[in-house]
Amino acid sequence: MPETARLVTRDELKSYMNTGTSAVPVWSLIGEGFTALSENKNPKTYARKYIHERTERTDVIGYAPSVPFTADVHTVDPVIAKIQEIYNGEKVGADAQVEILTVREWDIGTVVGTYKAIKRTYSTVCDKEGDGTDALVISGTFHAVSNISNGTFDGDKFTAAA
């Protein structure tokens, strides 16, 4: 019998940041304090109109993904700590890069207990801290610096697809 369609809720789309190292990753949930985190694919297009046609053609030739974020600063949260370390230290280049997993919990992996996931490296561009009068707020944008790596995530470990 075919699966019944259901509405996917926002809490089923999870993001995790590697707050460890490349050699020993620690995937920390991007959640506590975050009030905005949504991906923009920012497709790059090539448009042209040939002399024998009435309609212009447009092809997608690339992407420039970005993920704007806004977060209330919480103490002892490893994701907020990593972002603040980059912001307060005015880090640049590879020192401002983070790995982020995007996990779709409604999209089950082939191994029991796993979900399909995408890993990508982003440059962290924090543009301001201090908005708000109730809580300290930090905001910025993660800008893609790598291609995606498809795989699965079991809540602790990312396994790249073969």
Where are these regions (language model features)?
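Solvent-exposed edge beta-strands and adjacent loop segments
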Residues: M1-T75, T121-L136
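Surface-exposed, hydrophilic segments of mature proteins
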Residues: T4-R6, S22-A23, V92, R104, ...
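Extended hydrophobic/Leu-rich segments
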Residues: L13-M17, I100, G151, F158
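Intrinsically disordered, low-complexity segments enriched in small/polar residues
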Residues: N18, L29-G31, Y87, K91, ...
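Short, surface-exposed linear patches
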Residues: D59, G89-D95, A144-S146, A162
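Short, cysteine-centered beta-strand-loop-beta hairpins and adjacent loop/turn segments enriched
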Residues: H74-I80, I148-T152
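Short, acidic/charged, Gly/Pro-enriched secondary-structure junctions
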Residues: I80-K116
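Mixed-charge, glycine-accented linear interaction segment located at domain edges/termini
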Residues: A117-A162
